[in-house]
Amino acid sequence: MTHDNKLQVEAIKRGTVIDHIPAQIGFKLLSLFKLTETDQRITIGLNLPSGEMGRKDLIKIENTFLSEDQVDQLALYAPQATVNRIDNYEVVGKSRPSLPERIDNVLVCPNSNCISHAEPVSSSFAVLKRANDIALKCKYCEKEFSHNVVLAN
């Protein structure tokens, strides 16, 4: 690597790299997935240049690995993301999210009358594929919402 081609975000020795996140989505992922609730170092790259996307976000979390469920839950926000498992500075595993059947403990129901706002329950949504959209159905109020409505909440 020449001095003209240096990394824009420092490499990590061990942990997870979430790459190819659509620009402006990185912070939302950190918040929704509670990725900052750790004492491990997190490196965030925002609006980085990308050949295929134009611009992208990137998240690196040291000494932390995402479960398969967590990776799949990224599909609503970053369907083209790549989740890399890093060990000793090398990529030892690579996966892409696929739409799960359910998303638990991440989203908030947009229905202000939903019991999930008043009771200490974990959110839970069924993921329903529609012709031109992805709908999310709340386990508690049983209302269906376009995924964009829930994501904006």
UniProtKB/Swiss-Prot annotation:
Q: What's a BP term from Gene Ontology annotated to this protein?
A: 'de novo' pyrimidine nucleobase biosynthetic process
**Molecular function GO terms recorded:** metal ion binding
One family from Pfam that matches here is PyrI
Name the cofactor(s).
Zn(2+)
Top-level lineage group: Bacteria
Q: Which residues bind Zn(2+)?
A: C109, C114, C138, C141
Q: Which UniProt keywords apply?
A: Metal-binding, Pyrimidine biosynthesis, Zinc
Q: Tell me the cofactor note.
A: Binds 1 zinc ion per subunit.
- Kindly state one GO CC term assigned in the UniProt record: aspartate carbamoyltransferase complex
Give the family from UniProt: Belongs to the PyrI family.
Q: What does this protein do?
A: Involved in allosteric regulation of aspartate carbamoyltransferase.
Quaternary arrangement and interactors, per the entry? Contains catalytic and regulatory chains.
User: What protein name applies here?
Assistant: Aspartate carbamoyltransferase regulatory chain
This chain's source organism reads: Shigella dysenteriae serotype 1 (strain Sd197)
Gene encoding the protein:
pyrI
